[in-house]
Amino acid sequence: MLNTAFKLHSQGKLDEAEKIYREILDKEPENAQVYNLLGLIKLTKKELDVAEKFILKALSIKKDAYFYENLARVYEYKQDYETEIKVLEKACEEVHCGFEIYFILALAYKNNIEYKKSEKAYLKALELNPKSEKACFNLASLYLFLNSPEKAIEYFKKCLEINPNDKEVLYFLSLGYFRTKNYETGTKYFENRLCRGTAITSQEVTYPHLMQKAPLWQGEDISNKTLYTYYEAGFGDMIMFARYIPTLQKRCKKLLIKPQKELSQLFRDNFPDVEVMDLFYEENKTNFDVHIPFLSIPYVLGLKNDEIFMQHNKYLSATPDKIQYFKEKYFNNNKFKIAIKWQGNTYYETDRVINVEAFAPLFELPNKIYSAQTFEGAEEFTKLANKYDITDLSKDFKDFSYTAGALENVDLVISSDSSLAHLAGAMGKPCIILLPYNYNWRWHMDLSHCDWYDSVKLFRLGEKENWNELMKRIAKTI
């Protein structure tokens, strides 16, 4: 009966398997294995309390590492990491534990913000199974998270010893090199991002005629050719890498750029000699000789280390008419004007979302505060408007050229790591970027200076600090 039930279980026929498991328990009420298997069925169905009950019953009959592992997963699903850790630590005390227990324990420690213990558990897991790519990868990622890029690079390389062709590892290895400002090596490995879930991966959907139309540019002489470059990531990346457009113009006869439609007018205003294409312009209806994804530009240009930060002072600006429009409508006052943004695009990262009420210390200062929040998170504006004097600019942000017009009128921008922060930096506007503890690859180990933008200051969340505490620190510096 057990073999039949287990086969049904393996085939995903959970109700049929459960029925037989219960019949077995009627005859064998102390069968720990069956209680554990029933727990796994309930875990699969997300019936967590019932799963917990069954697996605890299994453990009361027999102490088994696999049972402890499954019980830990119940608490992981519940996001009760403290209890999960207690279960796994108890397993290590009571039974012989192998690789999987220590691997899960390392994950639990990380989720519970116990990073040193997480590191120790991963190292123990690797001691038990040195060829585990997932343990090497997670430990490397932990080191990257903890701003220890040299150790991250070491363990990403160990992953490659196990699986030399893992594009995901090669991509994350590039982020380690970026943190150390080794861009010559980092940009080479960064090309592996094109094998991940980006717009370029889905070229047949986003750019259906691209590969058939012309070859990728590999850095060869194109002085008599037309180059086409196109977006592949977020607004902030396009703004940050727009610094290379003048260099590209010098390399080719004609330059075509396809940014997102929200950036098109800003690029037209700043690069009048470049043909800026509309979002759904069809590649098969225009002429170009070679093409390149926008984030590949530094690599193909052969930029090394600090060369990548060219034009770090100011390379974008707003048009006079839009500056004047916002000045007359919003900025005719003598107060110190601060524009704030609390949330970027959560499609990419969710830890860049800041509780709007964390900005409260700014309202205790004699400033005039403006909201530049758009898209996701804009609904949070009312939480501030109900308590404080704050003006919403976003309803006039038809595209980034309008946003630039507004920013030209403010004295300071305070923003999460978002496109607004990149725009402020590219315009040379004083800007404070609020970084989570696990910050993005674009920022380096030394946060006392922003290499990309001279006008930007970086404030990083402490390991156990909250956004309210960070904002109080910032308020003292204004």
Predicted regions and their residues:
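Alpha-helical solenoid repeat scaffolds of the TPR/TPR-like class and their adjacent stem/linker regions
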Residues: 1-412, 417-478
